[in-house]
């Protein structure tokens, strides 16, 4: 029995180390003690975790039209892809909400025992047409963790390269290591076409960066409890792992699939066979990514099991000149607006003439880089003036013309006194 008179014999909390005189209550267990303060702290932690788990079930899920309208504000064109993504994402999170509400939602009807399967998304289209940006914008609207991974860095377990579990680590990091939050996030895997198997027939030799990666991705796409090394890299038996359930993680996989249009055309009978054989009646414009079928993806090099785990297939199309011009100026965070804000921080108004926007769009089309190349062209055009302006306080505005874009000249710099004279004349 502990003696109460001597400080050395006072009972202490096994967790915080406070003695029984420093706390209101000390509860004894088999060889351990816990004080009332530590019990309160434990209750707070448990309540916070339970609140986080229920968080998604309580938030108001935007309807497909609301998601579509939000995408319209930031992404130019690609209406079919935006519609498909809006519906797929809405159905995915509606499914999670139904699961979190459980039997209360079912209300005793005959659908009680129906379990809704997950619908991951395959996004097909040429580079620079907004595939990644669509996924990023979706995640921002839903306020869920979002991670981007590159399929080309992945290899089968045991070979040099990244394991597929490292993709999940990126999502956990995006959720600030809150696993419950990460389990309801979105993972975007780019360059998925680069892990197609090297030949249409199964190979005898190992294809560690192609078919092997597809096989490794199957389980996490479908839904499994994966063990993720907290520091990334390869697994080894003596390290601790983070356990994450991917059942409610939405996977959006995307790729350019160069050569897929030829496969689609061959299937549809567009191409003739043999020397001098006539071509089919369909023109090249009539068939494209939008006509893709699962059998085309199989011929391209995706394995049947992988295609089966991507039930929603949607496509984006090439961006034409008007679309590129719209991307430059119309969205909420359009490139022109971004650079105008940057110049405004130096007290300068940046002005683009209409023909300058046309010239920038034409250069992007010539380079074949799509929307992704617009920023690079803008940087090239504005670099000289961005170098000079911070050192000059006499400049009120900079005007970019088509000649500046095409020939590499410097934008026209208009001093403050010239602007003041123009205002006085107009007054």
Curated annotation (Swiss-Prot):
Component of the ClpX-ClpP complex. Forms a hexameric ring that, in the presence of ATP, binds to fourteen ClpP subunits assembled into a disk-like structure with a central cavity, resembling the structure of eukaryotic proteasomes. InterPro entries: AAA+_ATPase, ATP-dep_Clp_protease_ClpX, ATPase_AAA_core, Clp_ATPase_C, Clp_protease_ATP-bd_su_ClpX, ClpX_bact, P-loop_NTPase, Znf_CppX_C4. It holds the Pfam family AAA_2. ATP-dependent specificity component of the Clp protease. It directs the protease to specific substrates. Can perform chaperone functions in the absence of ClpP. The gene is clpX. ATP binds at residues 126-133. It comes from Renibacterium salmoninarum (strain ATCC 33209 / DSM 20767 / JCM 11484 / NBRC 15589 / NCIMB 2235). This is ATP-dependent Clp protease ATP-binding subunit ClpX. Disulfide bonds: none annotated. NCBIfam families: clpX, PRK05342.1. Residues 1-54 form the ClpX-type ZB domain. The keyword Transcription does not apply. The keyword rRNA-binding does not apply. HAMAP family: ClpX. One of its GO terms (cellular component) is HslUV protease complex.
